Regions:
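An edge-strand/N-cap motif at the start of beta-rich repeat modules
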Residues: 38-76
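Structural motif
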Residues: 55-63, 104-112, 149-154, 192-200, ...
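Post-signal peptide N-terminal segment of secreted/secretory-pathway proteins
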Residues: 68-136
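A short beta-strand motif characteristic of beta-propeller blades
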Residues: 69-79, 119-126, 161-168, 207-214, ...
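Repeated scaffold domains used in trafficking and secretory/extracellular systems
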Residues: 80-91, 128-138, 170-180, 216-227, ...
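Acidic, serine/threonine- and glycine-rich low-complexity intrinsically disordered segments
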Residues: 170-275, 279, 283-287
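Blade-level signature of beta-propeller repeat domains, shared across WD40, Kelch, NHL, RCC1
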Residues: 328-333, 338-362
Length: 362
């Protein structure tokens, strides 16, 4: 058990042993791309499916319309673009993704934003290896990265084109998200007996505001959603590294954890998406599909209903009144949210040779 905990927490040791000294500035520039069957109208697609490679700088994004008919394909020169472990981030008409880079190097050192109207890409250079996730608020962009037992919270001021770093020694920064007032960091560290977990809250000067011990709640937070000044964060493992299925409800005005919801007899939470006053939750089980479940959670009263799904959901996205999901076999499903989640259509998506499907976005 101890070895498994240590292996999972030490994943962020990937990358170069010694980082080159690089001038710590952010550079934004436009990158060219190739398009097959282009039709760059913003309203011609419902979801985008991202395929990528771990061994070469190749990725492609396939755009499907609301009937799951392929509209266009755009190719980009990135390795490990996107992941189903973290959600794509959205701001205005842009999707923000992490291209981690080839193999164990993970040295791409950048965030990309893709304009949903033009499909053009802008790169935001970040002087860090092994970037895990990105968060975007009104003015600031934040990334978490991990290297050689040190985690870094990196801030980019999109107005003044400046950056600020905060290092966390012997800690693993699993999730960062931000509002216009605060930055929220979920951090894990390993002691001799269990995984110690905290929620560290900072202002935008990266000055500490509050530190909440969440060890007894659990760890491995990777996703979140915000609804009416509250954040909803899934918890996948307990302090002893056992799978659990919990949901933290955090008040973003008071910075107090208001509630912890437990989902009994379910696998860990794989995906969450917000639809109107509901949170749609997939409980993933790659081993046994009959244990895969789906929860419809009412955000106004915390009541929920869990049903069997028989689909190992890998990624989810909402567009208009439809839910799109991708399973572990790369089948794309469209469900009608106005008709009791009726299955409307199912198609097979085939990634190019030597690529894999990393995630979907709306």
């Amino acid at each position: 058990m101890q070895k498994r905990r240590k292996n999972r927490l030490l994943l962020f040791k990937n990358g170069e042993v010694k980082m080159r000294k690089v001038i710590k500035i952010f550079i934004i520039f436009t990158i060219g791309f190739n398009c097959i069957a282009c039709n760059p109208k913003h309203n011609d697609y419902s979801i985008s499916v991202i395929d990528t490679s771990s061994t070469t700088n190749k990725s492609q994004i396939t755009f499907y319309d609301n009937n799951l008919i392929k509209k266009s394909i755009y190719k980009y020169n990135y390795a490990e673009l996107g992941t189903h472990s973290y959600q794509p981030q959205y701001k205005n008409s842009n999707i923000y993704l992490v291209p981690r880079g080839i193999g164990n190097k993970h040295d791409e050192k950048k965030i990309i934003s893709i304009n949903k109207k033009t499909r053009q890409v802008h790169e935001i250079y970040v002087n860090k290896n092994n970037i895990q996730c990105v968060s975007v608020s009104k003015r600031y962009l934040y990334t978490s990265s991990n290297l050689n037992m040190i985690s870094y919270l990196t801030q980019y001021d999109m107005k003044n084109k400046k950056y600020h770093d905060l290092s966390l020694n012997d800690q693993y920064l699993s999730l960062v998200f931000s509002t216009n007032k605060y930055v929220y960091c979920f951090v894990n560290s390993l002691n001799k007996e269990f995984i110690y977990s905290t929620l560290q809250i900072y202002d935008h000067n990266l000055q500490p505001i509050k530190n909440i011990d969440i060890t007894t709640i659990g760890n491995c937070q990777r996703k979140y959603t915000i609804y009416k000044n509250k954040a909803y964060i899934p918890v996948s493992y307990d302090m002893n590294d056992q799978n659990i299925s919990k949901l933290i409800i955090l008040n973003l005005k008071t910075n107090i954890i208001e509630n912890i919801i437990s989902f009994e007899n379910t696998s860990y939470i794989g995906e969450i998406v917000k639809y109107k006053k509901y949170l749609l939750i997939s409980h993933t089980n790659e081993v046994s599909l009959n244990k895969a479940k789906f929860t419809i959670f009412n955000l106004n009263n915390n009541k929920f209903k869990t049903i069997n799904s028989n689909i190992c959901i890998k990624s989810m996205a909402i567009k208009n009144n439809s839910l799109y999901t991708v399973d572990s076999l790369n089948y794309i499903y469209k469900f009608d949210l106005l008709n009791d989640m009726k299955l409307v259509k199912k198609i097979k998506h085939t990634p190019p040779k030597n690529m894999y499907l990393s995630t979907i976005a709306s």
